[in-house]
Amino acid sequence: MKTVTEFQNKNILVLGIAKSGYAAATLLQKLGANVIVNDGKPLAENVLAAELQAKGMDVVCGGHPLELLERNISLVVKNPGIPYSNPILVAAKEKQIPIVTEVELAYRISEAPFVGITGSNGKTTTTMLTFEMLKEGQKHPVIAGNIGTVACEVAQDAKENEVVVTELSSFQLMGVELFQPKIAAFLNLFEAHLDYHGTKKEYGLAKANIFKNQTENDYSVINADDADVMALSAYSKGQKVLFSTTKEIEDGACIKDNALYFKAEKVVEVDDIVLPGQHNLENILAAMSIAKLLGVSNEAITAVLKRFTGVKHRLEYVTTINNRKFYNDSKATNMLATEKALSAFTQPTVLLAGGLDRGNEFDDLIPYFKNVKAIVTFGQTAPKLVRAAEKAGLETIESVDTLDEAVVKAYAHSTDGDVILLSPACASWDQFKTFEERGDIFIQAVHKLI
């Protein structure tokens, strides 16, 4: 960890605990700050808050009182999930108090360079692929962010010869000031999180913060097939490395003659890749670009792609029952992810979909229903998905209350050779704490059929 003195004796407000807030507060105390921790959950129900209080921190729970800002606060470190419309953050901005997320703290203390990966879909798969390729290439990667360990915990132990590989959400990237990844990858942009950002434009600008501090000594890995991402890459001063699944890229990554190329050099045959889905070729090209920029050999990249079958809850194969294959794609929290999941299969498919209602309709899914023989909907968005399915002309449409019921109904509507796919196209928070919990419950329900 770098020697950092900028936080010594400063009053710093950590807003929202959870894993990232707990880690940030603990780090800041270690760096000599006077830490004030604030969380909306009452102290009696807040185990992490009680632990921080036991460490001698000033802990205020049960709301976000504006009076906290009267304590000569130098910096606010916010949980990514707390919107900037929260009154205490509005007041902090008015007082010109800097507001950051813990990823910013991680960057400031890290001896190791960062690779940052963002996009609406594919972040986790690309991050894991990048990590595996760098590991195979003996580049000493450590993984942090939305997957793995909280970034500022990883950064404390990261050495100069290591690489911190981190998946970054728009929520995290809104709170960066100095964060400067050596390599920044922007995979795609799809209309999402509008309840947080308001518009797709604001959402895209938040993600483009990944480029904010890059210089000509850094690299920006850009999806050349996404017009929005290409437009936002104008914010980067780094060296742009493009990737495409649809056209040849001489100075980047592309697919040609059934092989993946980087800077006109063949890296791996498509037939050697075991990860399913056309959309995953985009993720692979992005990860391959990062790996090649960091000096990983073609042999190491090929070795990873010959064994990497995917990430849990992302088109995860579950089991086969009576020649019906079950797939868990609970991470599909928006329509684009579900479109890509449906495009990955040519077999007749029974789709399970539904979840938190964020105000959007689902007509964009209709062209992707060509192989869908039945749909079972659940959650807040069930009526909207039913409407889209009716417009698509699906004959078998059901709505149920629970995911367990949905699995039973989906199996009942399937026949020999079908795919049964959970790809909700929605966030999970109407019925589940996380998409992981939703996926685990799906898997449990599937195994009950055996």
UniProtKB/Swiss-Prot annotation:
A cellular-component GO term for this protein: cytoplasm
Official protein name in the record: UDP-N-acetylmuramoylalanine--D-glutamate ligase
EC number: 6.3.2.9
Subcellular location: Cytoplasm
Gene3D superfamilies for the chain: Mur ligase, C-terminal domain (3.90.190.20), Mur-like, catalytic domain (3.40.1190.10), NAD(P)-binding Rossmann-like Domain (3.40.50.720)
Entry-linked HAMAP family: MurD
Family the UniProt entry places it in: Belongs to the MurCDEF family.
Disulfide-bonded cysteines: none
Function (record text): Cell wall formation. Catalyzes the addition of glutamate to the nucleotide precursor UDP-N-acetylmuramoyl-L-alanine (UMA).
SUPFAM superfamilies reported in the protein's UniProt record: MurCD N-terminal domain, MurD-like peptide ligases, catalytic domain, MurD-like peptide ligases, peptide-binding domain
Annotated gene: murD
InterPro entries membership: Mur-like_cat_sf (IPR036565), Mur_ligase_C (IPR004101), Mur_ligase_C_dom_sf (IPR036615), Mur_ligase_cen (IPR013221), MurD (IPR005762)
Swiss-Prot/TrEMBL catalytic activity: UDP-N-acetyl-alpha-D-muramoyl-L-alanine + D-glutamate + ATP = UDP-N-acetyl-alpha-D-muramoyl-L-alanyl-D-glutamate + ADP + phosphate + H(+)
GO MF entries: ATP binding; UDP-N-acetylmuramoylalanine-D-glutamate ligase activity
Binding site for ATP: G119, S120, N121, G122, K123, T124, T125
Keyword presence, ATP-binding: yes
GO process terms (BP): cell division; cell wall organization; peptidoglycan biosynthetic process; regulation of cell shape
